[in-house]
Amino acid sequence: MTNQTARSSKKERYANLIPMEELHSEKDRLFPFPIYDKLRRESPVRYDPLRDCWDVFKYDDVQFVLKNPKLFSSKRGIQTESILTMDPPKHTKLRALVSRAFTPKAVKQLETRIKDVTAFLLQEARQKSTIDIIEDFAGPLPVIIIAEMLGAPIEDRHLIKTYSDVLVAGAKDSSDKAVADMVHNRRDGHAFLSDYFRDILSKRRAEPKEDLMTMLLQAEIDGEYLTEEQLIGFCILLLVAGNETTTNLIANAVRYLTEDSVVQQQVRQNTDNVANVIEETLRYYSPVQAIGRVATEDTELGGVFIKKGSSVISWIASANRDEDKFCKPDCFKIDRPSYPHLSFGFGIHFCLGAPLARLEANIALSSLLSMSACIEKAAHDEKLEAIPSPFVFGVKRLPVRITFK
């Protein structure tokens, strides 16, 4: 590695890029919650010199960071024209615009198509004795829906999913080379997807249609159209958020049902509980483990002084298991009276696509359960492998055996 590359990798050594040192083993990455519990009890707000950031683990502290954008800014890391990394007032105006695509009416219109795609994927799965939930079901479903929303050909779904995965992959370790390789891969992935969506936008300008892309092209904020970089940033965000969050939400729900046959039978006996299973999966196996912010001024959090410009990582997965907020937080309970989890964020950056993710997950799990008598691990000693991302929780593959009706 050249000196220039080394300097670049150190410059890019942002807390989003490398894992916590405590999560060093595959076992810990597959089930990190005991570590979060220990950190939440012993150091609820702590500085990590390796990642040069402050980690926040308590529910109230995490919520405070997320709901105070003036104090904890979203402008961080590698900058793009994405709504995810904007602050008000720019964020407010753009969010109001793009939220039109996720109104209850707009999402409801996708229901039939989601059911059709789900039925097709499960029909294909019937032909196999063992299926990989990720590759055969949880992965294709949201990518197909998103591809259609963005005007991408369905046959490109494997391609765009591959590059979407690259954008959330973390460094394999904390070495300069690993960080530099990861930064290089992310930049290549972002460049590819930028060119990909730039081409689609060009086609929509020449031939408008009644779809999301045309709506975004024709929309105005204060009399101005969105810039191409803003449009591309939103397309990439929707792709990545939909792919990673929804794929892992569905897969994590199935993973838990294979781990707990009692809960699986309870849900089969009353499918009205599917929605509760989805919400409890969001809390118990949160697809997004953490969210990064940057302190805009010297401040205090949890009795700890944080200097202006410091990276602050809010650990949602830890907050979702805070014993001061949830009764028996380490138990998967489908009869919780409420679900104040933070898995879709909080405040102005609450996930726009949450209604769509919930709809897709509910349809996917309901259909899977109604068409089967049993879902179990493909092998008792099946070894799962965690997704190589510091902030996304899920597995690379989830082989299961489904007894179809």
UniProtKB/Swiss-Prot annotation:
Q: What EC identifiers does the entry list?
A: 1.14.-.-
Cofactor(s) for this protein?
Answer: heme
Q: Which SUPFAM superfamilies match?
A: Cytochrome P450
The highest taxon in the source lineage is: Bacteria
Protein biosynthesis among keywords:
no
GO MF, one annotated term: monooxygenase activity
- What's the family? Belongs to the cytochrome P450 family.
This chain belongs to which protein, by name? Cytochrome P450 109
High-level lineage: Bacteria, Bacillati, Bacillota, Bacilli, Bacillales
